[in-house]
Amino acid sequence: MVKNIKRYRKDLERENSPLAEKDELGRYVNMDIIPQTYIFPGDYNIFVEEFRRQPNATWIMKPSHRAQGQGIFLVTKLTQLKRWQNESKVPFSNNQGYKESYVCSKYLEEPLLVGGRKFDLRIYVLVTSFRPLKVYLYDLGFARFCVEKYSNDTNERENMFIHLTNVAIAKQNAQYNDKHGGKWTIQNLKFYLEQTQGKGAAEKCFDEINNIIWVSLKAVQGVVINDKHCFEMYGFDVLIDANLKPWLIEVNASPSLSTTTEIDR
């Protein structure tokens, strides 16, 4: 998805599309939907150059083909990556013999908090056709909250209970509440944002989320095999930052449909 979004932006630029408009800092106005992201091992050397340009940034590493928060960790120093390379025997510096690919994204260190906790949105999307693109959004998605209050302290970088919203992670914590599962419906979250941020700001935020979903699917429209007898269902994970800007974090091709609380049913 990341590579296709980047390619789609370049295609729009070549077409002089207004969707590819940039601001005075060179950032996309309408297509700035994903954090700065690299795919390892292929992008490792490029990432090292960028890391040295932003030595104080935090990055989040995720294995491409795992689920439930497994294998995710934060990186603030190159030595962490090099040590991890040696321990896991994954030679990023070349494409020989690595076990699995990883996605490395710039960590959004200032998320919007509710009750001091970080959260993200899980939105279910049904695509019945890619050509033409026909998309349906399920109204009853939900917000998932971290089980512990958020802290940007460097000493808390390894505490996944404040950084990850995955239920499988949260259940390992004694504070996990199995009645509500640390979840709100999206309708409840939107109502909360209307009350705390204003109705106009909340509506703008959710309009931008809809745009993220549409742009993401347009980006892969040309590479997904279209079969009128089939459909695709995706789980979009979106994080809202402190400025009420939504960011695409993940697109899950096989989202879990298991239920743990009434909100899921």
Q: Which residues are covered by each model-predicted region?
A:
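Short, solvent-exposed loop/turn segments at secondary-structure boundaries
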Residues: 62, 262-263
